[in-house]
């Protein structure tokens, strides 16, 4: 029975990663990030060990980055692409392990802060970090994007994770806290959009050309 439950948790964790991927361009369905992270937080309910939480985090991250980063394989080949996806997924181990602790202690409000702390580390270390996959990048077109002028992508990520945690808690307990975490960030984003004069006012087409990268392989970055 325990193996079946673990298998179910792993399946949901993988699905949560795919859901978060759907929020990024070119698909750009911003609610998918909220749904995906809510599914991931539900994987940790009612409580799991730190080891299981770490495993769930890795599966979530691996499914996300395998879908998000195939374009890298076009430049450096499939092996480096998979290696990068695995490396980035290692950071999600911390998300899952910490999330398991917070779920067990019912410190649900702290999960968004913990997630963004790990996201910051991944985006800055090592070698300047790798910021692809920040949860904020998937909120283009949604109300939470209007929070960016007040706190940058970190605030947008916190707001997204707050909504996700709130959605998960609406299916668990405490439902009142869940409703607050879900509604307040969306309301603030909506208010910020009104204060800034609404949505899009036009479109701009931009083209860029990168020259002198004629071949595949990791040495492409050495060319000038």
Labelled PLM ranges:
Residues 194-224:
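Soluble catalytic regions of membrane-associated enzymes that act on cell-envelope
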